[in-house]
Amino acid sequence: MDGQFEVRLDAPFYTDEHREWRDSLRRFIDDRLMPHVNQWDEAGEVPRAVHREVAEFGLTGLGFPEEFGGFSEGTDIFHFVIKAQELARMGAGGVATALSTHDIGLPPLIVAGSDEIKRRVAPAVLSGEKIIALAITEPGAGSDVAALRTRARREGDFFRVDGSKTFISGGMNADFVTAVVRTGADGARGLSLLLIERGTPGFSATPLPKQGWWASDTATLHFDNVAVPAANLIGAEGAGFALIMNNLNRERLMMAAGAIGAARACLQDAAEWARERETFGKRLVEHQVIRHKLVEMSRRIESGQAYLERTAARMQQGERCAADIAMLKVDATLTMEFCAREASQVLGGASYIRGCRVERIYREVRVNAIGGGSEEILRDLAARQLGFDTA
């Protein structure tokens, strides 16, 4: 990549280890993933063999305990930021998502699951042999997690689960699903987590065709009197809400990192096209209006990158910083949307052709702006955190 479009991995946030990790990861992505992303996107899936190859490289296990096949010693939150932004360079969010559903489905199990569940599930997922998904959203409840209705009734050594989940990334191919279910009264304290396994009688899934992220399957999950062993309870009954909320802030931070990475890919493609393409006897970049588009894209990207790194550093120090994470994700997805549009204007008709990186990114703007909390939900969350909702 032209150095002009690099993220500068400078101190105090980055070390030589971070730079070595990025170089190694970039070589792997450029050699093993980038040449195939359009093929996988058009096919609507990433082959299982690729999941295993990515795991063998070490990407799947990042941040997970060594005893289960992961690696966490010497890693920090900036390794995850680098991972998100390097995957975003592919301009194929569906591929990145398909290879990363474990990053949201597995942590609750690692934190609160029984030793038996951890030994049975984590190594299989971290080796790329199995896929795990997280199921929260329902047809009648999304960001309002406390309003979830999928019910799990205790009957002896089993829970009987009835209800449905929707918009579940990886839901069609998942071997395991970390599902939020209601085991108690209404509200947050009545929610629990259950590990539900593919093939269990009464558990089915239907695919949801969508605008972007084609390589990542998305599904509605149906639970019809599904018998789930009580041993598959993750944590205590009623602890589900806390486990999920602990996961959400990191998920939003990584979505912001990926959105800024995608915006940077748009800038690179627009700048390279503008330098090569000639109109009216001169290169596009010689037109002031085009140069100003590139500068404005760069300005927004670099501002967002600085906000991202500052917020990540605060999280690394143990701060919750929920308001900043919410505002960061809003800012990052707006930057992605702006840069996708401006890059499309610079590339013209070429940006509308399938196989073009900008074309894929343009289709993926909305899922980034909505997933993990919409702009409206996150703005209101930030307002409450900052005390703007009080008299």
Report residues per predicted region.
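Alpha-helical interface subdomain recognition
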Residues: 1-89, 100, 112-116, 124, ...
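Short glycine/proline-enriched turns and hinge-like loops at secondary-structure junctions
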Residues: 74-75, 144-146, 170-175, 188-190, ...
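N-terminal glycine-rich flavin-associated loop
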Residues: 96-116, 142
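A short, Trp-centered hydrophobic/proline-enriched beta-strand micro-motif
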Residues: 128-136
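Hydrophobic, small-residue-rich alpha-helical packing segments that form membrane-like cores
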Residues: 141-144, 159
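Flexible, small-/acidic-enriched active-site or ligand-binding loops
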Residues: 147, 199-229
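A short core secondary-structure module
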Residues: 158, 162-206
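Long, acidic (Asp/Glu-rich), low-complexity accessory segments flanking structured domains
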Residues: 225-243
